[in-house]
């Protein structure tokens, strides 16, 4: 304790030691009951040291004190962090978007099953920034509502410049998550609502409950139950908008045949009897809206045969607007028989037309020659009792008559005849739409630059149906269709499909999925232009470099040749000088240097010409330019 302030010169007196030397007090001090230390300070010290200085000295000297203090501080810090995280975690909100990001591996697996690839960054961008701008109610945090997903999908798949092909893999994956949710997404998927029950005509508060309806509502009616009829309700003025909504599309026709009375009396007798309250002003206004002239109503969506409010089949003919729209919005039978056949098939299934309606439909959508060809093919499809096509006139006329039959749609036998007639008519449309066999037409169907493999396959199958007698859906024709799909696909897709491993064991569905994957990984037009520009620049740079190298090589070759030429000239001159020196050194003492004869010297040579010396010719030197 010599370092403790104020203890200089102190006398330390220790009590007797404890009998148990292994026991220690706090911070290593002996226990209280075993003795204590008396500190006697300096007599001259007037003021005792403060306790803080004593504690600091203990902190500096005792390792146990430091360990205990650090442990207490660490525990407090951990407790604070735990409480903070608990409060924040309790306030976290899970959204469909965050849920998909937390299970991104499963999302990628589902996308791979759909033969598409998705990226997390674009997933977030489309969900939070792109799809909310479609004005279909898509929230920024995403949703698993099937209706909203379907509306966004329609926007994405829109043809022309309004579509978004780059968003197709992402909305397809969203749709797969909603319609086939994994376990972690099932609690967030909206349950599929049951199909809404169409309101029945007698349930409207405008007619007395016991009266027989004189006209049917536009909306499908329910068969009346066997129980007691509900009491009619009188709507208040606040419910006026509901009544307006129900009467937006009034029925265009009155019932030409009043339904049989069920014993409750007609509506004219029921109203004065006082069984129903007087109609309200809103109901009067509604009745006024529902009773315009029949000829002005041309926007009907009603079926020719449908169940009325009393459970009886009622007849509603086609409206002129429906026939007009079907004719103008579809190609002719000669141009595209498949599309028009599909339209007529849907009409036959949903509208359940009578014999007269079928003739009206064929007369509107087909030309005279096309109609005769369809009727002829339909009569050829009539089968006899043995199940094989028959040519017996009585059986053919009974199944597919050319004159108006007396089939009553209110009876079971009449409805059976109508069903058979519609089936034969559909078979006649399919057979009449086939052109003569022309395989060249099938081979001429090729995939467009921006056409998806699925759309191309549909066009190819339609060509098979139209120009060949084969059915592309037949398993025996799958190999031929698959080979045509590979050979007539786009060049980049066809090359990759031909290099697939185990190609002979691939089904047509496998080839389509692989083609879709290749199609989705194609570069965009902007990327293609950038690649072409970059390749052009690289080619120009490479050509310029090659030209510079060739020019440098040509200069080096020219300098090398000139150097060789100069070296040859210089060496020849040197040899000439050396040769002249050697010849001059070989002359004898009395030999002439001019005529090489002995007996005189060159200055006395008689053969040497005399007279003045002419000018010496100028010596020409060879330069690099020569």
From Swiss-Prot:
Keywords: Coiled coil, Glycoprotein, Host cell membrane, Host membrane, Membrane, Metal-binding, Phosphoprotein, Secreted, Transmembrane, Transmembrane helix, Zinc, Zinc-finger. GO terms for cellular component: extracellular region; host cell plasma membrane; membrane. Residues 195-211 have a biased composition (Pro residues). The chain crosses the membrane at residues 64-86. A motif (PPXY motif) lies at residues 250-253. May be cleaved within the capsid domain. Glycans are attached at residues 60, 113, 505. Pfam families: Gag_MA, Gag_p12, Gag_p30, zf-CCHC. A zinc finger (CCHC-type) spans 590-607. Residues 523-554, 574-607 have a biased composition (Basic and acidic residues). InterPro entries: G_retro_matrix, G_retro_matrix_sf, Gag_p12, Gag_P30, Retrov_capsid_N, Retroviral_Gag-Pol_poly, Retrovr_matrix, Znf_CCHC. A motif (PTAP/PSAP motif) lies at residues 199-202. The modification Phosphoserine is found at residue 280. A motif (Cell attachment site) lies at residues 383-385. GO terms for biological process: virion assembly. GO terms for molecular function: nucleic acid binding; zinc ion binding. Residues 526-566 form a coiled coil. Residues 195-310, 523-626 are annotated as: Disordered. Seems to be important for efficient replication in vivo. This is Glyco-Gag protein.
């Amino acid at each position: 304790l010599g370092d403790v302030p104020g203890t200089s010169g102190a006398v330390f007196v220790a009590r007797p030691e404890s009998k148990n030397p292994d026991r220690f007090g706090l911070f290593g001090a002996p226990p209280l009951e075993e003795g204590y230390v008396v500190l006697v300070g300096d007599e001259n010290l007037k003021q005792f040291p403060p306790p803080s200085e004593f504690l600091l000295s203990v902190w500096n000297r005792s390792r146990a004190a430091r360990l205990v203090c650090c442990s207490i501080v660490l525990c407090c810090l951990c407790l604070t962090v735990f409480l903070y995280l608990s409060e924040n975690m309790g306030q976290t909100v899970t959204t469909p978007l965050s849920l998909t990001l937390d299970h991104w591996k499963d999302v990628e697996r589902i996308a791979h099953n759909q033969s598409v690839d998705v990226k997390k960054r674009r997933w977030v961008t489309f969900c939070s920034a792109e799809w909310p701008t479609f004005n279909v109610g898509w929230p920024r945090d995403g949703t698993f509502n099937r209706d909203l997903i379907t509306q966004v999908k329609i926007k994405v798949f829109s043809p022309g410049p309004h579509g978004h092909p780059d968003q197709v893999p992402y909305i397809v994956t969203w749709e797969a998550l909603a319609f086939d949710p994994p376990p972690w997404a099932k609690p967030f998927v909206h349950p599929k609502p049951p199909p809404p029950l169409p309101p029945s005509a007698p349930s409207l508060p405008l007619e007395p409950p016991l009266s027989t309806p004189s006209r049917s509502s536009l909306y499908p009616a329910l068969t009346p139950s066997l129980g007691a009829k509900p009491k009619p309700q009188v709507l208040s003025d606040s419910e006026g908008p509901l009544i307006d909504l129900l009467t937006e599309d009034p029925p265009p026709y009155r019932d030409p045949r009043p339904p049989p009375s069920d014993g409750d009396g007609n509506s004219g007798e029921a109203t004065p009897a006082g069984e129903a309250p007087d109609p309200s002003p809103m109901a009067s206004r509604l009745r006024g809206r529902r009773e315009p002239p029949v000829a002005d109503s041309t926007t009907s969506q009603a079926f020719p045969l449908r169940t009325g409010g009393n459970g009886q089949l009622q007849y509603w003919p086609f409206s002129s607007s429906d026939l007009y729209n079907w004719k103008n919005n579809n190609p002719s039978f000669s141009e595209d028989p498949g599309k028009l056949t599909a339209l007529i098939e849907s009409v036959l299934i949903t509208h359940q037309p009578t014999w007269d309606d079928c003739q009206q439909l064929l007369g509107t959508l087909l030309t005279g020659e096309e109609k005769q060809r369809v009727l002829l093919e339909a009569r050829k499809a009539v089968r006899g009792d043995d199940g094989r096509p028959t040519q017996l006139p009585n059986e053919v006329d009974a199944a597919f008559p050319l004159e108006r039959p007396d089939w009553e749609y209110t009876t079971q036998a009449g409805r059976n005849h109508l069903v058979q007639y519609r089936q034969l008519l559909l078979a006649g449309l399919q057979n009449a739409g086939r052109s003569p066999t022309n395989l060249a037409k099938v081979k001429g169907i090729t995939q467009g630059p921006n056409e998806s493999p699925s759309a191309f396959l549909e066009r190819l199958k339609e060509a098979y149906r139209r120009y060949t007698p084969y059915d592309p859906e037949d398993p025996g024709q799958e190999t031929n269709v698959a080979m045509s799909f590979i050979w007539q696909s786009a060049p980049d897709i066809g090359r990759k499909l031909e290099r697939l491993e185990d190609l002979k064991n691939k089904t047509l569905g496998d080839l389509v999925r692989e083609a879709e994957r290749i199609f989705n990984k194609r570069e965009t037009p902007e990327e293609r232009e950038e690649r072409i520009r970059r390749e052009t620049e690289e080619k120009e740079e490479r050509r310029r470099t090659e030209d510079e190298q060739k020019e440098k090589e040509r200069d080096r070759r020219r300098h090398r040749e000139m150097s060789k030429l100069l070296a040859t000239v210089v060496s020849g001159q040197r040899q000439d000088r050396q040769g002249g020196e050697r010849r001059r050194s070989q002359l004898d003492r009395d030999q002439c240097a001019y005529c090489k004869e002995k007996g005189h010297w060159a200055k006395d040579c008689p053969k040497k010409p005399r007279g003045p010396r002419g000018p010496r010719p100028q010596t020409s030197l060879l330069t690099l330019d020569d």
